């Protein structure tokens, strides 16, 4: 684990940002190579190991290593003053999204075939919503790479027919830039019973305040917030919001939701 001394040394200051921003960013393919490490303290693999190679600075220089070791959590992008999408550079071949199946509805749940299709199918039936299942998203968060924009437009065109499109997984919400289902659950009139720590997914960090508000309305009594990446660490006493955590043996909010709905 990286030392606190190192983390304190990597501090974002106005001067540091100013020096970075005067670089001809628009002329370089990867500004991370010229960056002094503004985002390092946000990188889980760097914080966990203290190894500079296993950080955005290393991943920017060694894409083959990045495809294997980077968690594709996008936290570095959120910290970057120019929001450079480093994980998109790890593969040159764009990730193409494909429609697998479609069930119409006023509200459409969107799921990935390889992440959360079984869970989404059950939720769709229980909540009485439509369901769009696509393929391709999971690969983006395993190996990295840009999204094929033409395929995204096709998916968005399909979703435009619905009143509301909601992503079951953080990966889908992030890729398609649509709201995560958890934000709208209170409006659907469902409740859960839980008191304890809650995990905020890396890819949903921008929704943090909204997520906490939605969870409170759902009936969650929050005692603390966990923000460790599920690809590095899982805890038995934490409630997770992402289906990926369920695949890793974690307690997921959707399990509580389905259990609650089955008793009513």
Predicted regions: what they are:
Residues 2-15, 21-29, 86-264:
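Iron-sulfur cluster-binding electron-transfer modules in prokaryotic oxidoreductases
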Residues 33-65, 69-95:
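Iron-sulfur cluster-binding cysteine motifs and their immediate structural context
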């Amino acid at each position: 684990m990286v030392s606190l001394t190192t983390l304190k040394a990597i501090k974002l200051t106005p001067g540091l940002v100013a020096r970075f921003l005067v670089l001809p960013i628009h002329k370089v393919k990867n500004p991370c190579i010229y960056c002094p490490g503004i985002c390092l303290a946000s990188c889980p693999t760097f914080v966990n190991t203290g190894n500079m190679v296993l950080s955005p600075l290393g991943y920017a220089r060694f894409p083959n290593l990045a495809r294997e070791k980077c968690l594709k959590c996008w936290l570095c992008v959120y910290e970057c003053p120019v929001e450079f999408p480093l994980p998109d550079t790890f593969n040159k071949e764009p990730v193409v999204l494909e429609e697998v199946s479609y069930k119409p509805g006023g509200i459409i749940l969107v799921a990935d075939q390889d992440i959360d299709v079984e869970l989404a199918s059950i939720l769709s039936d229980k909540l009485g919503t439509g369901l769009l299942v696509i393929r391709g998203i999971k690969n983006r968060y395993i190996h990295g790479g840009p999204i094929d924009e033409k395929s995204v437009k096709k998916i968005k065109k399909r979703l435009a027919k619905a009143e509301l499109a909601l992503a079951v997984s953080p990966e889908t919400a992030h890729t398609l830039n649509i709201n995560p289902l958890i934000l709208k659950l209170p409006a659907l009139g469902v409740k859960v019973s839980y008191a304890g720590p809650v995990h905020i997914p890396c890819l949903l960090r921008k929704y943090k305040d909204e997520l906490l508000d939605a969870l409170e309305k759902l009936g969650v009594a929050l005692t603390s917030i966990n923000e460790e990446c599920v690809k590095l660490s899982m805890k038995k006493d934490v409630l997770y919001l992402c289906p990926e955590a369920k695949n890793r043996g974690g307690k997921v909010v959707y399990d509580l939701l389905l259990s609650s709905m089955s008793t009513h």
